[in-house]
Amino acid sequence: MRRVSAALLTVIIGAAALTACGDDKKTDDAAPAAGAGFPRSVKHAMGTTEITRKPQRVVVLDTGELDDVTMLGIEPVGAVSPHMKTEGGFPAYLSAKVKNTKDVGPMAEPNIERIMALKPDLILSSKVRHAKVYDKLKGIAPTVFTETTGAPWKENLKVHAQALGLEKEAQAAMDAYEKRAVALGEEIKKKNDGKAPTASVVRFVAGPTRLYQKQSFSGIVLSDIGLRRPASQDVDKPMLEVSPEQIDKADADLVFVTVADDPKKTQQGAVQDNPLWKGLGAVKNDKVFQVPDETWMSGIGIQAANRVVDDIAKAAGVPTPK
């Protein structure tokens, strides 16, 4: 019996060892799935960055990056306050997605100490915003920069998604947005005898009033929808600054107006009291629509773009696309 017991014990021990090996194999198989595609190298505006693990603690230093990461289901541990928002705080349209996000200072001068204290494993920004502090940032965590902001927002999303390992999710969201934009354009043309109306974008800031052209975030969205632009904005540039005496350049079938921060700091009052403004066809036809600056100008991502689509549908008097 003792020999049999010893044999049985040997079998039991062997089986347990095999089971343990099997469990280890499952664990090994599961680990890559949790961080599939990592480590990886990401080429960007400042060079190439090695990201060893799927990022979990992300800091974003501009609004486009904030829109992108929250759209992809990530609540950043830290973010900057928008540079046009002097009262501080994050964009209202993203408030539900940044409840635990820490403010790391203004966009123009992010607080390096606050960022370091958050122990991020990825930092996202752009060369145009933060080239001067890139070396400090990359000393804290892997840092990925796009070249600039605004017009290349779709390309920027691809870079951010690559750094996060969420390329498929980003592409699916972009496809859905572009489908909505095209559907809206078709509905608008149906209502206007097959012809797309012209759309103008006016922004009042602390300085000369701006007319936004084709190479801007809002300009790309208008193009996706298929709206035409007035001559002053049908240009492959970001924007045109105008004086109150040049505001007639803003006229179009639909005029969308945003105000950056405090209206008292802008020329809004002077412009809209000007006879030239009152003489615009859009003003006379009640086709001027004030829309949120934080989505039309500062959003620079799919979530903001979808809200622009919603605003245009409402202004054009057509159903909001699904």
Which positions does each model-derived feature cover?
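Proline-aspartate-enriched helix->loop->beta-strand connector
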Residues: 119-124, 142, 251-255
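Extracytoplasmic substrate-binding proteins
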Residues: 132-205, 302-322
